[in-house]
From Swiss-Prot:
EC main group: hydrolase
Signal peptide: none
Protein family: Belongs to the metallophosphoesterase superfamily. LOC643853 family.
TM stretches of this protein: 15-35, 129-149, 156-176, 205-225
Species name: Caenorhabditis elegans
Main location as per UniProt: membrane
The organism's taxonomic lineage, starting at the top: Eukaryota, Metazoa, Ecdysozoa, Nematoda, Chromadorea
Keywords associated with the record: Hydrolase, Membrane, Metal-binding, Transmembrane, Transmembrane helix
EC identifiers of the protein: 3.1.-.-
Name of the protein this chain belongs to: Putative metallophosphoesterase F40B5.2
Amino acid sequence: MSSRCKRCLNSFSEMNLKLKIAIIVIGFIHVSIAIARKSTDGVAHHRLVRLHTILITSTAMLSASYYIWKRVNFAITKLFKTLKSENELPIANSNESESDFAMNTLLPSPNPVGNRRLRLICFQDIAQALMMLFLFLSHIAMFFYYIFLGPEPNVIAITSLSFIAAYAHILIFLLIADVLFYSTKLIHSKVAPNSVHTYLKENRCYHILLALILGFIFMFAGLYTTHTDPIVRSASIPMKRFQSNSGNVSIALLSDVHIGPSVGRTRIAKIVELTNALKPDIIAIAGDLADGLVRDFHGAAEPLCNLKAPGGVYFATGNHEYMHGNVTEWFWFLENCNITVLHNLNKHITVNGQKLCVAGADDLYALRSNVPGHGMDLRKALGTCNSDSTNILLAHQPNAAKIVLSDSELSKKVNLILSGHTHGGQMYPFVPIVHLANAFVRGQYYDKSTDTYVYVSAGVNYFGPPIKMFGSCEIIFITMTQ
């Protein structure tokens, strides 16, 4: 047995009994759900996946919350200790007992210094209580995908989900502060006294409070973005297969609508209004329509039935249709709204004299979702798209676009790929991760070797926290030109 394994066993044996039992129970629950996920499919499978995701997130957040609480509580305690020391009362005179002096210190009195000290004690308790409430609401955020669901977001749900964004930013800023503190401490111990570390040590509580304040600033800035209208971003893409004696074709691209606990009917109605005002020839919904079941969010989704385009409204699945709802029920809902579902299918249309083949493939995640009959099949989706038409593919994840471009046969069939999924990162700290995980991140791309364009939308909405970077809630208006 390695020395690392021995250390782990020794650490476990040193834990108290209650902690050992808690770890064993949590481990047993995770293993049981993981086994159950392998043996189920369809709706039962996605419900287990959601439950397991919540448990994994909650388990990870316990450690993160302990870390945040220790740091912030240290800063609050030190700050109020400093303030109280500045308001200390004179030492009791010889004619006053210690108990009388203590009573006079704590009880309101004509002495303004004593009253200030009492108020500081109360403010410290209030600050600590508010921090505990913040952590609690952050922990229960994921449960609002199951409770208080309806046509419009619940106020408590919006607050809790917003706090998740502040929580993530605070955690990251605290980690950055600690990396700076301990790295300078290491240098300080090996070389001459380090003025940087001395400064960080003396002002550590203020840097922790700064991390807290910055977290909430980013949260409120993100709330402003998601509570204003999505911007319309225009793009012009030349199509070599277009007939010179015919007109241009416009497409309104909507991706990542994410109808759910933080996106309701009012928001969807506004998106529909803005989209219809563009008078597009085609409307494409490139996945991640909803984060729940039709029975919970049909009221919020109903305005989608008002989308109008002469060339039709088309939909292809994203990963969230498989993770958060019954995808078949959403297909029925959309078809009843005269929205064409492209379930590894294509449709031939003629718009403004131009021949088009609009295709849609199931999301990359579909196969892993264990939903019978679902899985990305690009050959089937593009099967009847011919070389004499301009072929458009709806593929939610940009990595699906990469698969198409890497295939010599498929790439000949596609002229334009429309994707979403990335949210452009959604929040600033996640931008590097999105760039690492996706072949394309945001905006217009051109692959010269295949003469194919890819457009990735940052999404019209957001997932989970109603927080997004400035200018990243967008409706894409593409004009395909000759």
